[in-house]
């Protein structure tokens, strides 16, 4: 499979398929620092990034905002002193789409 960071998000309509259990098992191995959370019955990807201070956390948040606008796919973001919690899911399908895994991998790349 092509590296997730080399892929582009595709338009995700309300009738787009959610990832299957098999796809989930394969894709989650490609982003090992991410976990799967279920909130209100909606499966989501989540990761907490740690930073030395608020300014670094905010700089990361701003880079993530630029990436989200570029890919036209937007996460939940909670920026706090020393950490940023990022949550990816596809609102239109109320669950996980391949786009979410692509964006999780690209989010990790922002640390480089």
Curated annotation (Swiss-Prot):
<comment type="similarity">
    <text>Belongs to the pterin-4-alpha-carbinolamine dehydratase family.</text>
</comment>
<dbReference type="Pfam" id="PF01329">
    <property type="entry name" value="Pterin_4a"/>
</dbReference>
<protein>
    <recommendedName>
        <fullName>Putative pterin-4-alpha-carbinolamine dehydratase</fullName>
        <ecNumber>4.2.1.96</ecNumber>
    </recommendedName>
</protein>
<dbReference type="GO" id="GO:0008124">
    <property type="term" value="F:4-alpha-hydroxytetrahydrobiopterin dehydratase activity"/>
</dbReference>
<dbReference type="InterPro" id="IPR036428">
    <property type="entry name" value="PCD_sf"/>
</dbReference>
<keyword id="KW-0456">Lyase</keyword>
<dbReference type="InterPro" id="IPR050376">
    <property type="entry name" value="Pterin-4-alpha-carb_dehyd"/>
</dbReference>
<dbReference type="InterPro" id="IPR001533">
    <property type="entry name" value="Pterin_deHydtase"/>
</dbReference>
<dbReference type="GO" id="GO:0006729">
    <property type="term" value="P:tetrahydrobiopterin biosynthetic process"/>
</dbReference>
